[in-house]
A protein has these predicted regions:
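Alpha-helical transmembrane segments
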Residues: 84-97, 170-174, 296-303
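N-terminal transmembrane-helix/juxtamembrane module of multi-pass inner/ER membrane proteins
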Residues: 2-144, 182-193, 325-381
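Hydrophobic alpha-helical transmembrane segments
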Residues: 136-157, 212-213
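Membrane-embedded catalytic cores of phosphoryl/pyrophosphoryl-handling enzymes
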Residues: 193-336
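Cytoplasmic membrane-interface segments at the C-terminal ends of transmembrane helices
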Residues: 68-83, 151-166, 187-188, 214-228, ...
């Protein structure tokens, strides 16, 4: 039986420098250097010194796996947040097709679209006509939208949000596919109109503008998300109204386009995880998101209620295209587009933040620091 320390005590100078690293045995070193030991990983064979490159390659995956066991919110949003994204996304897509059906398959709906299409260009104030005529340039809409979308992709790539880059790619494909509905959806002949009798929904230019705006919103960091929502929503409204002033599209085309894009974006956000989220340790509540999101959602709902009230007032004159219904139809159309855009972008802003930055202990503190590599440490002794 071996002697213990009580039988052969080791006397050390209390004033001498102590090398705590050399004093630990190999088992203690392994417990310190194992990045998953504190996270409850299963013990395995004792590792020998590995190259730094091999260690770094597997460290990210190992830490994600360990953090997922310790705190699942570090690698994926709450289930309730993902369910909200899916539910609101489906509701917006359903609303898009509901508006299209009401405005295309009913007499009052076609009359409403026809009044706005025919009378809006000549009933705008002078300053608004100038702005709309500038925006209603196809090359300008494409150029500005591409710049906004490119800024979003660059922001995601610079932040190394690779899962988010993949989500953006899927969203772009879905938005492009939605424009193919224009050649598929029917438009029955119900009333005689001066506008083209073929289906024109959804609006391709509005889809492009809205898609670029939502890409920017979901890709930028927390500090500028609220600003991105305001800028993107404003650009979407300008493009949507401009294509109506230029008589390229009807009111229902624009509303359908905005709701489709935001609805598809919310469904894509339901699959957010890992690098599609903010880094752990940087997840905090955002005052700007709370204020701007609340204003957009509340303001959007109020504007939509006002638009619905005005439509109800002019409804008796729609089927005869009465002159007294013209002004109300125009006001309700523009106000409705602004309200729907504000509500959609406000919801998207709020849901993007709760999927990107779910609050938890590790989300606030951050992941444990990476320990030094044994081989590299021994080489520096």
């Amino acid at each position: 039986m071996g002697m213990n320390d009580a039988q052969h005590p080791v006397i050390r100078d209390p004033h001498a420098p102590a090398n705590m690293v050399d004093s630990m045995d190999f088992a203690t070193q392994r417990a310190v250097h194992d990045p998953l030991a504190a996270l409850g990983s299963a013990p395995g064979k004792e590792r020998t010194a590995e190259p730094v490159v091999d260690f770094d390659r597997g460290l990210s995956y190992d830490l994600d796996r360990g953090l997922a066991r310790l705190d699942p919110l570090t690698v994926r949003p709450r289930i309730s947040s993902r369910v909200l994204c899916a539910v609101f996304g489906l509701l917006m897509i359903a609303a898009a097709f509901g508006i299209w059906w009401l405005c295309v398959h009913t007499e009052n709906g076609q009359s409403y679209d026809e009044i706005v299409w025919k009378q809006l260009p000549s009933n705008l104030p002078g300053w608004a006509s100038g702005v709309m005529n500038v925006v209603a340039q196809s090359w300008l809409v494409i150029a500005v939208s591409c710049v906004l979308g490119a800024l979003g992709v660059v922001a995601a790539a610079v932040r190394r949000r690779w899962w988010l880059v993949g989500q953006i790619a899927v969203l772009a494909a879905l938005c492009w596919a939605s424009t193919l509905l224009k050649g598929v959806l029917p438009r029955p002949f119900i009333i005689q109109t001066d506008s083209p009798v073929v289906n024109s929904a959804p609006s391709g230019h509005t889809v492009l503008a809205a898609a670029a705006a939502v890409v920017l919103l979901i890709a930028v960091p927390r500090a500028v998300r609220a600003l991105a929502a305001v800028v993107g929503g404003t650009w979407t409204v300008l493009v949507g109204v401009s294509v109506m002033v230029g008589q390229w599209h009807r009111t229902s085309d624009v509303l359908m386009s905005i709701l489709l894009v935001v609805g598809l974006t919310l469904i894509v956000l339901a699959f957010t995880r890992t690098s599609g989220m903010d880094d752990p340790g940087r997840r905090v509540s955002s005052v700007s998101v709370q204020i701007v999101g609340s204003v957009l959602i509340t303001g959007g709902l109020l504007l939509m209620l006002y638009s619905a009230y005005v439509i109800w007032q002019v409804l008796p004159g729609l089927n005869v295209i009465a002159s007294w219904a013209v002004q109300g139809s125009i006001v309700s159309s523009v106000v409705g587009i602004i309200g729907v855009t504000a509500l959609a972008f406000g919801l998207l802003l709020a849901l993007r933040h709760i999927t990107a930055a779910p609050l938890s202990r590790l989300g606030l503190i951050g992941a444990p620091p990476a320990p030094p590599v044994q081989g590299a440490q021994r080489g520096t002794r």
